[in-house]
Amino acid sequence: MWAETKIGDILPWEDVEGEAERLLESTRANARDSENSRAIQEQDDDRIVDRDETDPYNEVIFGRRRPDSVAIEWTSKTLYILEFKHTSAQRQDYRECGEFRARDQHDVLVKSLETVAKEAEGDSAGWTVKLIIFVGGTCGSVHVQTFNSNLKELGVVESKRNAIRRGFVHELLNAQDTVERFE
């Protein structure tokens, strides 16, 4: 996916990977410190488990949990990380829960890109990184104000937003119908 996005033309991908590794190692060290504190209290070293390459957190940037899409606005030098979440609309806070999951999922990637962008020089200088999250409920629920705000951020003209939202809701309902047929 990353080769197709041309992110490497904007920011050196090796730098992004290096920053991600630093963030992941810092997180692991904090987790180990926390686990060590608990282990001392419990006197049970068997419960300490080190993370490895199969760690889902590590997959945020390198594996299956990559973002759904990436959009690049060359004029304003903005890199958009796009994530679409489909969640149960039975709870009133379905949108907030979906947004939290997406932020957590892409935290390392976004922070890595932001750090490398801040340190960039020459043609790579001046880029910003934004995570745009679209959340839809299982029954086609969409928070209109947030959805329109996201489309506005992406530069979609107001006259096109309702049609795009209707298409999004249609896709949500098709996905739900597919799930129900196979249950």
What feature does the model see in each segment?
Residues 10, 50, 74, 89, ...:
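A ubiquitous, low-specificity "background" feature that marks scattered single residues
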Residues 3-84, 100, 123-125:
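Active-site metal-binding core of divalent-cation-utilizing nuclease and nuclease-like domains
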Residues 22-25, 111, 118, 149:
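Polar/charged alpha-helical tracts
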Residues 78-123, 133:
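Mg2+/Mn2+-dependent nuclease catalytic core
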Residues 74, 87, 138-141:
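Generic structural motif
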Residues 12, 16, 111, 115-118, ...:
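Short amphipathic alpha-helices and their capping/turn residues within compact interaction modules
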